[in-house]
Design a protein with these regions (language model features):
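Interaction-interface detector
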Residues: 1-124
Length: 124
């Protein structure tokens, strides 16, 4: 099963479908008049995963991330980039994911980013 993302005129993902065969981008685009790009359900941060671990064959990694509604397709990177979660976060161009300006605390607690305080706050 392959997955395909429909792009709008601004390269925003507006729809994602599953289809039975590979390499249907051109066929979907021609038949619907919309632009479609294949996306890999098992790709995240430029790494392809099988059963939750990086796959031995990384040639299956496709467009950095599985496309979701609201993601952007970046033609120059050939990548799906998720929406920016906070204004202060920075795009890691190597993996096409947004990173916080401060690393997540590693003390085992559950934290959430507080944009106003520009810090991680313990979730209670």
């Amino acid at each position: 099963m392959s997955h395909y993302a429909q792009l709008d005129e601004n390269n925003m993902i507006v729809f994602v479908i599953a289809a039975k065969s590979d390499h249907k981008e051109d066929e979907f685009t021609e038949s619907t008049g919309n632009v479609w790009k294949q996306t890999s359900y098992n790709t995240y941060g430029g790494v392809h995963y099988t059963d939750g671990v990086p796959s031995a064959d990384q040639s299956k990694a496709l467009r950095y991330n599985y496309a979701g509604i609201g993601f952007t397709y970046d033609e120059n990177r050939d990548a799906f980039i998720p929406p920016k979660p906070f204004e202060s976060w920075i795009l890691d161009e190597g993996i096409c994911l947004w990173q916080p300006p401060l690393p997540y605390p590693e003390d085992g607690g559950n934290y959430r980013w507080d944009e106003d305080l520009f810090s991680w706050e313990l979730d209670q």
